[in-house]
Amino acid sequence: MAPNNCSHLNLDVDPFLSCNDTFNQSLSPPKMDNWFHPGFIYVIPAVYGLIIVIGLIGNITLIKIFCTVKSMRNVPNLFISSLALGDLLLLVTCAPVDASKYLADRWLFGRIGCKLIPFIQLTSVGVSVFTLTALSADRYKAIVRPMDIQASHALMKICLKAALIWIVSMLLAIPEAVFSDLHPFHVKDTNQTFISCAPYPHSNELHPKIHSMASFLVFYVIPLAIISVYYYFIARNLIQSAYNLPVEGNIHVKKQIESRKRLAKTVLVFVGLFAFCWLPNHVIYLYRSYHYSEVDTSMLHFVTSICARLLAFTNSCVNPFALYLLSKSFRKQFNTQLLCCQPGLMNRSHSTGRSTTCMTSFKSTNPSATFSLINRNICHEGYV
């Protein structure tokens, strides 16, 4: 018996929940039977399982480093730990639910699950994209407006900002929980009826268009547009700083500029990964929403949908490994936590990675330009 794979249909109406439904008849669309291979039933959940395991290892290790290594508890690392927590939430809720539809021909989580799971999943997506926006704002302040940084109670303020991101994300996800329900759907071509967990019934074609466009704007386009503005000013400031730096230079200023470049590059990599991994999922959701009355049973649509979903979940496990490649301090801590390196390594990292406040002023070759570079917790290379 072919599995319940309505993820290849346009009836998949939630970009974060995918298609979790119960066929009243254990049937697959006839067109699909011509090309669907039974091996998909096991291969696809296995890929989901691999993503979950890798993501759990990476994100749990990252959070453990932040909680146990005092020198790593700085402003950007707190945001990144919050990002890792959101990724963990997505991996332990959305990924197993998504994988279950290939192993069972019915919705396994009841009406309560139909309301709770979309809420949790949308909260996680909101935490991810809004935290990336906050990280970009933090890098903007550190590089473009360093004089605005207040060292006192900085970590406490960032904790409040991180908590506010979670609260806003949950508030935005409340409509998903309120309106999601088990709705009946009917496929005319195959004369099949099934029950689908969706945020609206099949009767109104306007609802999916509004829902898909709102999700695309709020959780993708608008945050990425804000991030782009921040990084435009960051890039402009770094270019100007490079031109205005005296020829003889100041070793401390050069190191600080290089450190800020590394931090900005790391956040930009996170943003790029998010944009790349989530764009296909949003595009397919928009396509389905604007072709709601049609049912696409083609192999191309089925495979593209699966790849888009897997790519979206992959985003929840790649950030720790991107950090591993970009940050020497995190790489040392990661090896210590995960690979059980010698105990002395942790102590050395504490002494060499101690937080300090650096202030350096110098005159550029332009007499009217004076730079005062102040930032907390970024003089060392330690950046998770």
Curated annotation (Swiss-Prot):
CDD domains reported in the protein's UniProt record: 7tmA_GRPR
Keyword Transmembrane helix among record annotations: yes
Molecular-function annotations in GO: bombesin receptor activity; G protein-coupled peptide receptor activity; neuropeptide binding; neuropeptide receptor activity
Chain ranges on the Extracellular side, renumbered to this chain: 1-39, 98-115, 176-209, 287-299
Similarity annotation: Belongs to the G-protein coupled receptor 1 family.
A single Gene Ontology CC term: plasma membrane
Residue spans, topological domain Cytoplasmic: 64-77, 138-153, 236-265, 327-384
Domain of life of the source: Eukaryota
Tissue-by-tissue expression: Detected in pancreas and brain. Detected in suprachaismatic nucleus neurons. Detected in neurons in the dorsal horn of the spinal cord. Detected in inhibitory GABAergic interneurons in the lateral nucleus of the amygdala. Detected in approximately 160 neurons of the pre-Botzinger complex. Within the pre-Botzinger complex, there is some overlap with neurons expressing Nmbr with some cells expressing only Grpr or Nmbr while some cells express both. Detected in cells throughout the cortex where it is coexpressed in most of these cells with vasointestinal peptide (VIP).
Location(s) in or outside the cell: Cell membrane
Listed name of the protein: Gastrin-releasing peptide receptor
Keyword Cell membrane: yes
Residues carrying a glycan: N5, N20, N24
InterPro entries: Bombsn_rcpt-like, Gastrin_pep_rcpt, GPCR_Rhodpsn, GPCR_Rhodpsn_7TM
Gene name of the encoded protein: Grpr
Residues that bear Phosphoserine: S351
